[in-house]
Each structure stands twice: as structure tokens, then as C-alpha cells.
């Protein structure tokens, strides 16, 4: 399993302001374990390995991974 910004068929990650929106989006639409709003896009945790995710910098990934843990 992996973490990241899950993308839809048009290659876009859902934009957000609220974390509960992302949790629903990540769990119900992308079947992840959970999700939250990180830097204005929905960041999902526990995505299946074959899910497409947005290419992001390591710095941004570390930031989003770190924020949910703490």
C-alpha cells in the first residue's frame, strides 16, 4: 500500500479546504484507509499499489506523510 494524492480519470487530485471531505473522497472513491487535506489537495493513506497518484516532490510527500502522523 502507498500514500499520495489519488487522481481521477482526468489526472487531477481533488482540491479541498476541509479534511472530512478528503476522508470521504479517499475512502469511498479511491478505497484508501483514510485521507485528509494537505496543501489544498486530498492526500490519501493506504492506497492500493496500482492506484495512480500525482507525481510530487519528496519534500511535499514527506510533509504530508509527517503531518498525518503527528
Swiss-Prot record:
GO biological process: defense response
The keyword RNA-binding belongs to this UniProt entry's keyword annotation: no
Disulfide links within the chain: 16-37, 22-42, 26-44, 38-64
Keywords: Disulfide bond, Ion channel impairing toxin, Neurotoxin, Secreted, Toxin, Voltage-gated sodium channel impairing toxin
Residues in LCN-type CS-alpha/beta domain copies: 2-65
Organ and tissue specificity: Expressed by the venom gland.
Keyword match Secreted: yes
Pfam families with a match to the protein in the record: Toxin_3
Gene Ontology CC entries for this record: extracellular region
Gene Ontology molecular function: any one: sodium channel inhibitor activity
Localisation: Secreted
Main location: secreted
Gene3D superfamilies according to UniProt: Knottin, scorpion toxin-like
Domain notes: Has the structural arrangement of an alpha-helix connected to antiparallel beta-sheets by disulfide bonds (CS-alpha/beta).
Family: Belongs to the long (4 C-C) scorpion toxin superfamily. Sodium channel inhibitor family. Beta subfamily.
Biological role stated in the UniProt entry: Excitatory insect beta-toxins induce a spastic paralysis. They bind voltage-independently at site-4 of sodium channels (Nav) and shift the voltage of activation toward more negative potentials thereby affecting sodium channel activation and promoting spontaneous and repetitive firing.
Listed name of the protein: Beta-toxin Isom1
Organism: Isometrus vittatus (Bark scorpion)
Lineage: Eukaryota, Metazoa, Ecdysozoa, Arthropoda, Chelicerata
Amino acid at each position: 500500500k502507498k500514500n499520495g494524492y489519488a487522481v481521477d480519470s482526468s489526472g487531477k487530485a481533488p482540491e479541498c479546504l476541509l479534511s472530512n471531505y478528503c476522508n470521504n473522497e479517499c475512502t469511498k472513491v479511491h478505497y484508501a484507509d483514510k485521507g485528509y487535506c494537505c496543501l489544498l489537495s486530498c492526500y490519501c493513506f493506504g492506497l492500493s499499489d496500482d492506484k495512480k497518484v500525482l507525481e510530487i516532490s519528496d519534500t511535499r510527500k514527506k510533509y504530508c506523510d509527517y503531518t498525518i502522523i503527528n
